[in-house]
Amino acid sequence: MDTTRYSKWGGSSEEVPGGPWGRWVHWSRRPLFLALAVLVTTVLWAVILSILLSKASTERAALLDGHDLLRTNASKQTAALGALKEEVGDCHSCCSGTQAQLQTTRAELGEAQAKLMEQESALRELRERVTQGLAEAGRGREDVRTELFRALEAVRLQNNSCEPCPTSWLSFEGSCYFFSVPKTTWAAAQDHCADASAHLVIVGGLDEQGFLTRNTRGRGYWLGLRAVRHLGKVQGYQWVDGVSLSFSHWNQGEPNDAWGRENCVMMLHTGLWNDAPCDSEKDGWICEKRHNC
């Protein structure tokens, strides 16, 4: 039987019957191979698409889960933010209340401080009045003693019970006076007088002032008088026994508190008074003490 050789796709050859029957057999196999190839390709594409769809579905599910998680977290964060806002509001209200209480407390404290200052001022004034009263009482006692000494002076020749003034001291109306030659500061002068059981001179009136003027011997002397200041300004003058100044014998234009530091008073050689710095060493001093009777 005649045969015809045909080549297959794979490179090998195949013998088929010759003639029309052989050619028919050969060409009838080709559509089968084509259909098989198309089927295989389709299956492959179906598998690939199935894999891609499965992967896309998985990723979509993951994205949806992530989106749900984000929404859940966002809801939680929103709730937490709302809670924080409420807490901030509560804190703001609390702070406002505390601030109001603080302002009220400050106002009450200010009122209490004002009342305390008023009470302290009243107490200070009362203390000053008591001190002034005691000093004036002491001065009154000394005045009575002076009058008594004057009465005793009238019978001095018949009664010599009072001790004489120390050597270099001058006597006048029941008191002894010492006029220094050296010069020093006001504080040192007061110390010198205290060492002699005396004090810087207190001028009680015109008679005593005349006695002092007559014995200046051309020198200046510290008196027992100092300025009283309040808030840096001179409010008055006070003797060393605590009594405020009543009698005065100021020089013209005095006291002037030059440079705001003239706190002590001295007597010029003319007998007139002048305010001066307490640390000045240009003047002597006059000590005074009562006779020892």
From Swiss-Prot:
Expressed exclusively in fetal and adult liver and in lymph nodes. Specifically expressed by endothelial cells lining lymph node and liver sinuses (at protein level). The keyword NADP does not apply. GO terms for cellular component: external side of plasma membrane; plasma membrane. Pfam families: Lectin_C. GO terms for molecular function: carbohydrate binding; carbohydrate derivative binding; D-mannose binding; fructose binding; glycosylated region protein binding; pattern recognition receptor activity; polysaccharide binding; virus coreceptor activity. It comes from Homo sapiens. InterPro entries: C-type_lectin-like, C-type_lectin-like/link_sf, C-type_lectin/snaclec_domain, C-type_lectin_CS, CTDL_fold. Binds mannose, N-acetylglucosamine (GlcNAc) and fucose, but not galactose, in a Ca(2+)-dependent manner, in vitro. This is C-type lectin domain family 4 member G. Disulfide bonds join 264-278. Keywords: Cell membrane, Coiled coil, Disulfide bond, Glycoprotein, Host cell receptor for virus entry, Host-virus interaction, Lectin, Membrane, Phosphoprotein, Receptor, Signal-anchor, Transmembrane, Transmembrane helix. Glycans are attached at residues 73, 159. The modification Phosphoserine is found at residue 12. Residues 1-31 are cytoplasmic. Residues 53-293 are extracellular. It is a single-pass type II membrane protein. PROSITE patterns: C_TYPE_LECTIN_1 (PS00615), C_TYPE_LECTIN_2 (PS50041).
